[in-house]
Swiss-Prot record:
This is DNA mismatch repair protein MutS. One of its GO terms (molecular function) is damaged DNA binding. It comes from Burkholderia cenocepacia (strain ATCC BAA-245 / DSM 16553 / LMG 16656 / NCTC 13227 / J2315 / CF5610). The keyword DNA damage applies. It holds the Pfam family MutS_III. Belongs to the DNA mismatch repair MutS family. Gene3D superfamilies: 1.10.1420.10, 6.10.140.430, DNA repair protein MutS, domain I, MutS, connector domain, P-loop containing nucleotide triphosphate hydrolases. The keyword Nucleotide-binding applies. This protein is involved in the repair of mismatches in DNA. It is possible that it carries out the mismatch recognition step. This protein has a weak ATPase activity. One of its GO terms (biological process) is mismatch repair. One of its GO terms (cellular component) is cytosol. Keywords: ATP-binding, DNA damage, DNA repair, DNA-binding, Nucleotide-binding.
Amino acid sequence: MTTLSPEAFAGHTPMMQQYLRIKADHPDTLVFYRMGDFYELFFEDAEKAARLLDLTLTQRGASAGTPIKMAGVPHHAVEQYLAKLVKMGESVAICEQIGDPATSKGPVERKVVRVVTPGTLTDAALLSDKNDVYLLAMCTGHNKRGVAVNIGLAWLNLASGALRLAEIESEQLAAALERIRPAEILTPDGATDAIPAGAGASKRVPAWHFDIASGTQRLCDQLDVASLDGFGAHSLTSACGAAGALLLYAAATQGQQLRHVRSLKVENETEYIGLDPATRRNLELTETLRGTESPTLYSLLDTCCTTMGSRLLRHWLHHPPRASVAAQSRQQAIGALLDAPANASLDALRSALRQIADVERITGRLALLSARPRDLSSLRDTFAALPALRERISAIVANADALARVDAALAPPAECLDLLTSAIATEPAAMVRDGGVIARGYDAELDELRDISENCGQFLIDLEARERARTGIANLRVEYNKVHGFYIEVTRGQTDKVPDDYRRRQTLKNAERYITPELKTFEDKALSAQERALARERALYDSVLQALLPFIPECQRVASALAELDLLAAFAERARALDWVAPTFTDEIGIEIEQGRHPVVEAQVEQFIANDCRFGPERKLLLITGPNMGGKSTFMRQTALIALMAYVGSYVPAKSACFGPIDRIFTRIGAADDLAGGRSTFMVEMTEAAAILNDATPQSLVLMDEIGRGTSTFDGLALAWAIARHLLAHNACYTLFATHYFELTQLPAEFPQAANVHLSAVEHGHGIVFLHAVNEGPANQSYGLQVAQLAGVPAPVIRAARKHLAYLEQQSASQHTPQLDLFSAPPAAIDDLECADAPALPDTPHPALEKLRDIDPDDLKPREALDLLYELRTLVRSHDADGHA
């Protein structure tokens, strides 16, 4: 605890001195200071909380001559206020009364029992059911010369106890943070590492917390091992430094040991298919480009029956394994679930899973001794349901190794279940302070105290009947009031019948009130029975929590198995409902998708046109041409999504699909200005293209959509041509290259590994019908004017564009110049077309021609067309009569 100078306390009351000491230890944290039924905030904390939470700011007296500004929240509603503050990135120290007000001399003893921060949430009320919350620490590693060589990362899901380490290059930091999405990031004081905007709440901690030797020892102590060799982490020095700071910070916020952090996973970048931030964003895995949660691949796949399964799905989507072995194991399990006999049907299994509690997070709270009564009853009911759940999958475990592993892990911890069954009431109260949590029969003393409290009325009735019979006083009454407690009342005319063991308690005008040894004994028990029962129940509950701690590893094992079973069952349900198939894998280079469909778009439309996609050693780049809105981007995205789904372990939306090795997926689809970073749309596009050209390998899948926009026509065309050539000649990756530069369709003549495909459309009048079918060969036109018309561009603009298009096509044909890209640069204004190369226009145009130019046949009714025809004939005759040719 920080010690303040005596001068700092001069003039302050004892209570404010206590507060100031506590606040000095948490200078950058809001302190919720418990006073009775409220948590109070003082001084600057009060002003800040009032502003953030819209609380009333009050002022009560002064301390050391300074007005005491106050704001408070009721203790029973504290969680809703904590949730708001954490969402804003704030941290809150919860300071509770731990002393007894009745026996305290001076202020009641208080201390901070926990600190709630964005990255250390465990309370159910503060957590999103389907999102994990990560605390991450980063530590820069240096060589002997002091040169930075890497960045060590350690991140912890405190709610589950999952701890992971990795070491990355500095340029990989943005991608790593996008994948992990930490809620809070710890960095050393004085560090210069640039954390990308929006990556998470940043927290500076003392640099010595990141000491590598101390961190390594702290990690070994946490995992109860002598060395980290068994986890493959012995050489990750900077990551161990980060882990040391992370564990120190997390334990400090909880005010206790992290008993559930018992394992460690080291992540290697070669373990998963690489997905950079642009790819995760463009494929809309868990969030749309508009920032909404639906429609996304995650929202389509998430039919999980438990929140554990939903969280695991999110993790799998962002961590598709490169090795196809994991995917094949999962798909084998899906097949077994789909082929299960009636007694182990998929529907029956999912119905049973809906009754399962969130064992993962309950276990986390149990380890931190913060589990509530209904957490324990839910854990008990889940463990009791495990035998029936295992019975449902027992018939099919032989057909799938993944299911056999899950089945073995679902063996219920018998001793844990016995303790929960005997100790916890069938339907306990929400909070221990409300009573009714410990089951009857678990503790004789508690049962007796409850009996006294619950049977008080009956005891008094029985006592009154016995005393009337014993004394012969017919109007004797046994009663109670708050001032005098229990008493026996006898009217004055009957006092001569009072036995010797009656002791006078109160004299009234017409009666005497007595107490007997038996009634006094009962009174002592009854008056304190409820209070003593609650205290006894609290002590018993705490002892139950302590007794459950040894079962944490078993609870974690069950939670992991339940999440995997639930997710596999959800994959099976999606495959059955949406007519998906199991993909196959090969070690050969290639991708073969027959009648593939975009999983998310298909769910949003009535009819979806399926398309094939084929890559191989002799076919590495597809040049995709066709109209805007024709489906080029959809076709590219669906190819990437089908590949990702296959490696995640799901069935895929296709008639058949086969995949060779894939190490990374890149996308260059669409872009927007990066205003905060000072980058234009074109700069963003080129940055993404550079990453692809530098990092793509022959096993990478690359999506390039209309590269070269945002600059001059010839600059853009030159860049697109050079980029496509480089991808073919040097990267040799699987590439889907959509373009409006029709000059690029000549590329297959130079590179046989390139092929032209196009999205077809049919012109109808001045309109267009998109067929969304992918065909071999290049498109014959872009249909840009028709798309513009569909978009609602005014008719005069469309007519002017048609005139200019005809002129440009005529000019191109006469001069043999390349076709211009109509979508990269706007055409010159019609009024500016009089240039040296333009044909001379007649000084006096024919009036009939002028009239014809202004006509839109699609807008004419039959009668109007006939009248116009007569008008044109009149104009021609009149013009000829004036002597014109």
